[in-house]
């Protein structure tokens, strides 16, 4: 029993003891990435019930939506070049994510009004493309922020040695992974609660539920913006 407790203490509890407030900004952005799946189920229902898109078209759209992630490395170089203005990059990414969510909300709740401007399929494609661009931009900045988050001196002004700095970098990366996983688990629990007994709802109530989830999801860009403000 003592060995189990020691393992849990060394593996998990010690991470909490090593936490520093400077770690919080990138962790907020990572949490935002973790909860980004909140609208995944709703998006699936929307495609199935409202859009007449072929499997080939959706596969092609998935390819284009994945392009921003393939460009993560050159984007990282761009962040290095304009590092002093990194907050604008996060704001830009958060704005794209918010626009994507609001477009989907409009498509679900105000379908007729939106379709008078562009077709529903066109709006859906725009939303699908905007979101990954926003997430990639934020993810690149968060990765760079993890380096800045590790302090070089302690409270007394003494410099940390190389081993201590290496440990702090490892802790920061581990906490980042936990933040993403924690956000994902939280989203799973929220989806279970929100979609409980959804099959018994009237169609109008289902539409309102689907739309409200996209409004709830606006907390995602809010989290990332808070990470920069902090």
Language-model features: where?
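Intracellular loop-helix junctions on the cytosolic face of multi-pass helical membrane proteins
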Residues: 1-22, 99, 103, 108-125, ...
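Residue-level signature of the transmembrane alpha-helical core
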Residues: 27-31, 63, 94-95, 129, ...
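Small-residue-mediated transmembrane helix hinge/kink sites in multi-pass secondary transporters
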Residues: 45, 73-80, 188-193
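Central cavity-lining transmembrane alpha-helices of secondary-active solute carriers
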Residues: 59-82, 94, 98-99
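Conserved glycine-rich helix-kink/hinge and helix-boundary motifs of the Major Facilitator Superfamily
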Residues: 27, 59-60, 91, 167-174
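Helix-loop boundary and gating motifs at the non-cytosolic
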Residues: 2-69, 130
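Structural signature of the two symmetry-related core transmembrane helices
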Residues: 87-104
